[in-house]
């Protein structure tokens, strides 16, 4: 069985994947292993087959901000493969896992050979630009309290069996949330205490429950309207 067929990005295409797969490398990684670092000159694309990684960017002053996590089925490194510029992010493993490492020439060859894959890449890049634009807007106009609300909503999913509630699993560490929204851990801790006292969030075993997500949504919407 052709292993590239395990990668969602290449499913249901008319490509003969075997020849491309011969030019890729498959390797396992360990927890806390750095897969890609800032300013690396490599241009390979990494397709996550198993495991989870975290993506960080760094300001000129050295401050690091978490862009997010990636899991099996997702990939990173496409920008360097496209423009050949040094890596702009650090990608570190959160768990053990496996990646398919595809050289940039192979990636570009596939993109130009398959209209289906080409469109998938365009849609993915458009989605990422929209997400970054939304986060830029939040960092520009919202205070840390409302940035925290927005991030919690973004990280959450519907809580099964509890209508109207949302849940973040596993519960996020305060220092991780701080790195996501650009503030200090102590500030996140204070806001969590306030949200808990208001009955808006609840910490359970293995999860953070957002009891009334509509309240957080309304607060964010009102804060954004005030900036217009």
Q: Residue locations for each model-derived region?
A:
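Cyclic nucleotide-binding regulatory module and flanking cytosolic helices
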Residues: 1-34, 76, 80-81
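Cyclic nucleotide-binding regulatory domains
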Residues: 8-9, 33-96
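Cyclic-nucleotide recognition modules
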Residues: 17, 68-126, 130
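Glycine-centered, phosphate/nucleic-acid-interacting loop/turn motifs that mediate DNA/RNA or nucleotide
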Residues: 199
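Short, cationic-aromatic polyanion-contact patches
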Residues: 159, 173, 208-226
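Basic amphipathic alpha-helical segments that dock to polyanions
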Residues: 194-195
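Polybasic "coupling" helices that flank or enter modular domains
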Residues: 112-185
């Amino acid at each position: 069985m052709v292993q590239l067929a395990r990668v969602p990005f290449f499913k249901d295409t008319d490509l003969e994947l075997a020849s491309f797969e011969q030019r890729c490398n498959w390797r396992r990684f360990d927890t806390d292993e750095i897969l890609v670092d800032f300013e690396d000159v490599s241009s390979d694309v990494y397709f996550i087959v198993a495991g989870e990684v975290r993506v960080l960017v760094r300001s000129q002053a050295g401050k690091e901000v978490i862009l997010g996590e990636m899991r099996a089925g997702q990939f990173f490194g496409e920008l360097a493969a496209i423009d050949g510029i040094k890596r702009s992010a650090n990608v570190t493993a959160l768990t053990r896992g496996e990646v398919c490492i595809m050289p940039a020439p192979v990636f570009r060859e596939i993109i130009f050979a398959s209209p289906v894959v080409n469109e998938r890449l365009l849609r993915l890049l458009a989605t990422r630009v929209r997400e970054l634009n939304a986060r830029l807007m939040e960092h520009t106009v919202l205070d840390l309290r409302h940035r925290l609300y927005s991030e919690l909503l973004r990280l959450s999913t519907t809580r099964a069996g509890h209508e109207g509630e949302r849940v973040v699993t596993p519960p996020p560490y305060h220092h991780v949330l701080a790195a996501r929204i650009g503030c200090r851990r102590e500030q996140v801790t204070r806001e969590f205490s306030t949200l808990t006292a208001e009955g808006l969030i609840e910490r359970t075993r293995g999860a953070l429950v957002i009891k009334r997500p509509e309240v957080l949504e309304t607060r964010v919407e009102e804060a954004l309207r005030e900036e217009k």
